[in-house]
C-alpha cells in the first residue's frame, strides 16, 4: 500500500478524473471499499462496533462508502460527521443518502472531542 500526502492525493484524483475520465464516485467507491477489504485480515467485521469519522470533503464520501461495506459485513457502524454538510460534494451527498437509507446512524459533530462519548 502506498500512502500519499494530501496534495498528492488531490493531484492523483484530478488526473484520474480529467485525463482518464474516471468518475468521482468510482474513486470514492474504490477508496471506501479498499479500506474495509484491506483491514479484513485484522478486523472481524461481523458484530464489530465501528466508528467512522467523516469530514465534508471527498474523503467523507470515502468514509460513507467504507461505512456501507463494513455494515454489509455485519459491523455495527456509527458515522461521526464533522463539518458543514452544505459544503459536501454531490457525490458525497449521494453516498450519505445511501447510508441513511441503510439505517446507519450519522451524528454531526463540530469538534473531534464531541465524538468521544460514542467510542466505547
Task: Identify the residue ranges that each predicted region occupies.
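Glycine-rich phosphate/dinucleotide-binding loop and adjoining beta-alpha-beta core of small-molecule
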Residues: 1-4, 44-53, 60-120
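Positively charged, low-complexity intrinsically disordered leader regions
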Residues: 1-48
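Short, flexible micro-motifs
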Residues: 24, 35, 58-64
Amino acid at each position: 500500500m502506498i500512502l500519499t500526502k494530501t496534495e498528492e492525493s488531490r493531484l492523483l484524483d484530478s488526473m484520474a478524473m480529467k485525463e482518464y475520465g474516471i468518475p468521482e464516485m468510482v474513486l470514492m467507491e474504490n477508496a471506501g471499499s479498499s479500506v474495509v477489504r484491506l483491514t479484513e485480515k485484522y478486523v472481524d467485521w461481523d458484530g464489530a462496533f465501528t466508528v467512522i469519522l467523516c469530514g465534508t470533503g471527498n474523503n467523507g464520501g470515502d468514509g460513507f462508502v467504507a461505512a456501507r461495506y463494513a455494515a454489509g459485513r455485519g459491523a455495527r457502524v456509527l458515522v461521526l460527521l464533522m463539518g458543514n454538510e452544505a459544503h459536501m460534494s454531490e457525490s458525497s451527498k449521494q453516498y450519505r443518502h445511501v447510508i441513511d437509507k441503510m439505517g446507519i446512524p450519522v451524528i454531526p459533530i463540530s469538534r473531534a472531542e464531541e465524538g468521544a462519548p460514542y467510542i466505547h
